[in-house]
């Protein structure tokens, strides 16, 4: 089976590439060149028939991913499907099913069947439930069985923590971190490695993993098991050593035509973000970078969507290609629908703010909004806003008597004042 990367290397412009080119207003040659060399990916499993393809990477708009899924404390698949509907409403490009309890295949199959967004999973989360074995009883190649099952079901990309091999694990042990390993998948694999005194199975059998990805054109999202879970741990030896391992794994995937993106931090002081984006691009030869936040402070509990949006905007402006949303419930509980909405909007704002910095053409919508404000065209403002529904609701909660202003400024509306005076009219504030 050929992947999007293989087709690009042969100069074949697939229907998925055509859709992305139209969405991004990019040329055929630009896309072919950058998909062929790995700087742009189009996650598109051959079995995901409902997919509306999107590209991630160089020269493209920053994409947003929404996480959802059940846990052993909250098993309500109907609510998770409502989160999917909400993600679709906001035109989210990627959805990850992070369910880590029970038999998850039915929900995942439904997700692939109904979702136009690309679907991602973390197969190691599903290992215990799928295999019906406790962690210590799972064999190295058992993990690949889970990967195969997910790939066959139509998942477009998978987080695989192949970089935390014995070398990276050794450096982690010497790192004296405050928060150790905060990646769920990474912590599970590390525990398995320690209990079995064995190499990371995804690293040991990486070629077998690539064969699965090739068969279904699954994009590898190389997970950062050693991402910093606190600003204290950011940019340390453990994080960077794993990134080096991921760069080597990226090249091996590219050599056979498997698409790759790299996952990144995490928690990180705002002054370290740009350098980390540049380092990933340098080490991984331009492979798309998919970051969680980064959260720029550790004390924003209840408001981590704000901390994540601040870091995400800086990351996107500095080269990050996809942002994983962060909700107000981060670090506290499974998010509800309102948390998901707040996280989506905050992250879309961050992604767009970054795009204005790196893709000047993306300012056009902002200019239209500014024009609508100058013209005091409320309906146009609501239409252009990222969350126009909330904007309209807030406006109507204290609707002004004179629609040439809002309830904040009333007759002292600066826009209305300037519109009148520049037309040669007198201004009356009485």
Swiss-Prot record:
Cofactor note: Binds 1 [4Fe-4S] cluster per subunit. The cluster is coordinated with 3 cysteines and an exchangeable S-adenosyl-L-methionine.
Gene Ontology molecular functions: 4 iron, 4 sulfur cluster binding; carbon-carbon lyase activity; zinc ion binding
Annotated keywords: 4Fe-4S, Iron, Iron-sulfur, Lyase, Metal-binding, S-adenosyl-L-methionine, Thiamine biosynthesis, Zinc
Protein name as catalogued: Phosphomethylpyrimidine synthase
Gene name in the database record: thiC
HAMAP family tied to this protein: ThiC
Residues where [4Fe-4S] cluster binds: 406, 409, 413
4Fe-4S in keyword set: yes
GO cellular component: cytosol
Binding site for substrate: 67, 96, 125, 161, 183-185, 224-227, 263, 290
Signal peptide as annotated in the record: none
Subunit structure: Homodimer.
Family the UniProt entry places it in: Belongs to the ThiC family.
InterPro entries listed in its UniProt record: ThiC, ThiC/Bza_core_dom, ThiC/BzaA/B
Catalytic activity: 5-amino-1-(5-phospho-beta-D-ribosyl)imidazole + S-adenosyl-L-methionine = 4-amino-2-methyl-5-(phosphooxymethyl)pyrimidine + CO + 5'-deoxyadenosine + formate + L-methionine + 3 H(+)
GO biological process: thiamine biosynthetic process; thiamine diphosphate biosynthetic process
Root EC class: lyase
Binding sites annotated in the UniProt record for Zn(2+): 267, 331
Pathway where this protein functions: Cofactor biosynthesis; thiamine diphosphate biosynthesis
EC number(s) from the headed UniProt entry: 4.1.99.17
Keyword set includes Zinc: yes
Cofactor: [4Fe-4S] cluster
Task of the protein: Catalyzes the synthesis of the hydroxymethylpyrimidine phosphate (HMP-P) moiety of thiamine from aminoimidazole ribotide (AIR) in a radical S-adenosyl-L-methionine (SAM)-dependent reaction.
């Amino acid at each position: 089976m050929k992947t999007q990367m293989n087709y690009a290397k042969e100069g074949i412009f697939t229907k998925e590439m055509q859709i992305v080119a139209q969405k991004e207003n990019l040329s055929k040659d630009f896309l072919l060149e950058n998909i062929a060399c790995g700087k742009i990916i189009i996650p598109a499993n051959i079995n995901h028939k409902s997919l509306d393809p999107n590209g991630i990477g160089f020269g493209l708009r920053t994409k947003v991913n929404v996480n959802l899924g059940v846990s052993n404390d909250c098993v309500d698949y109907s609510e998770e499907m409502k989160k999917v509907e909400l993600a679709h409403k906001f035109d989210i490009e990627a959805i990850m099913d992070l369910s880590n309890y029970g038999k998850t295949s039915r929900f995942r199959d439904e997700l692939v069947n109904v979702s136009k967004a690309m679907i991602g999973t973390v197969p190691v989360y599903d290992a215990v439930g799928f295999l019906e074995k406790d962690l210590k009883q799972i064999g190295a190649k058992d993990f690949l069985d889970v990967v195969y099952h997910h790939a066959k079901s139509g998942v477009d990309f998978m987080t695989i923590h192949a970089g935390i091999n014995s070398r990276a694990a050794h450096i982690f042990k010497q790192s004296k971190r405050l928060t150790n390993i905060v990646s769920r998948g990474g912590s599970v694999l590390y525990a398995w490695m320690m209990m079995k005194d064995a190499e990371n199975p995804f690293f040991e059998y990486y070629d077998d993993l690539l064969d699965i990805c090739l068969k279904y054109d699954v994009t590898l999202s190389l997970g950062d098991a050693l991402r910093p879970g606190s600003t204290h741990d950011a940019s340390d030896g453990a994080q960077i050593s794993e990134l080096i391992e991921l760069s080597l794994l990226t090249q091996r995937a590219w050599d056979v035509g498997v698409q790759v993106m790299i996952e990144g931090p995490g928690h990180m002081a705002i002054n370290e973000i740009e350098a980390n984006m540049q380092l990933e691009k340098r080490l991984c030869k331009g492979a798309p970078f998919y970051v969680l936040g980064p959260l720029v402070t550790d004390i924003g509990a209840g408001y981590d969507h704000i901390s994540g949006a601040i870091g995400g905007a800086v990351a996107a402006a500095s080269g990050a290609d996809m942002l994983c949303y962060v909700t107000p419930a981060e670090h506290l509980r499974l998010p509800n629908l309102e948390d998901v909405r707040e996280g989506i909007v905050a992250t879309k704002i961050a992604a767009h703010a970054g795009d204005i910095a790196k893709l000047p053409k993306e300012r056009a919508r902002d200019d239209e909004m500014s024009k609508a404000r100058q013209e005091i065209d409320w309906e146009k403002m609501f239409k252009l806003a990222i969350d126009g529904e909330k904007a309209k609701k807030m406006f109507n909660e204290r609707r002004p008597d004179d629609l040439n202003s809002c309830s904040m400024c009333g007759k002292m509306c600066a826009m209305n004042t300037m519109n009148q005076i520049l037309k040669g009219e007198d201004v009356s504030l009485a």
